[in-house]
Amino acid sequence: YCVNVTAIFIDIVGSSNITDERKRPTLAKMYRAFLSECVAIMNAEIDCKEININGDCVWGVFDTPYKSDIDNVISVAAKLNSMIKILDYKLRKKNYSEISVGIGIDYGRALMVKAGYSGSGINDVIWMGDVVNSACHLCNKAGRDYRKVIVISDVVYNNLNEHNQGLFSSYSDGWVTRYEGDIINISMNDWYNENCK
């Protein structure tokens, strides 16, 4: 069935270069830390209906029937961005190079389909629709080519409260206006400042 949702994607920028410069055990630990922390942050939200991992990309689908729910997804993005700051500190301490990420967010209708083969044990919920594709596309622009870490669609921006709108600036992406920001979670940032010196 169709439902209005907000999709968020986060992936590591330049991950193919990371595999070239790191040994496999180190790479596995770094990816495991990144993926598990992203999943934990998304999974902690009651509105999160689905989390998927594709390579170095983690994406979630959030049930957002109210505008305040969309603001909550922005706070998830801020937590993800703050978590990367902490993870980079841990990587620096071990003399590993830091990682950077892109986060893309969009809102719209998605088709939820249960797909698989009966009796095979493969019977997953699949989320399809422009909102999922668009959030993935925005993620691929975020954190690259002078873009800030978080890129959101105009639909997401227009549904945010005034405070959250003030955290983003607009830019033109062809004929479309997008919004970008580098927002953080204040309490996580305070913890970072106290513990990561």
Language-model features: locations:
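Catalytic-core segments of nucleotide cyclases and related cyclic-nucleotide turnover enzymes
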Residues: 112-139
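Juxtacatalytic helix/coil linker segments
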Residues: 1-29, 36, 40-45
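Switch/connector loops and helix/strand junctions flanking conserved nucleotide-binding motifs
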Residues: 111-115, 159-162
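Catalytic/regulatory signature loops of cyclic-dinucleotide turnover enzymes
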Residues: 106, 130-155
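Short glycine-rich beta-strand segments
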Residues: 11-13, 104-110
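Short beta-strand elements
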Residues: 45-53
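Short helix/loop segment flanking the catalytic signature motif in cyclic-nucleotide metabolism enzymes
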Residues: 23-26, 53, 57-98, 105
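Intrinsically disordered, glycine/charged-rich C-terminal tails and inter-domain linkers
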Residues: 144-197
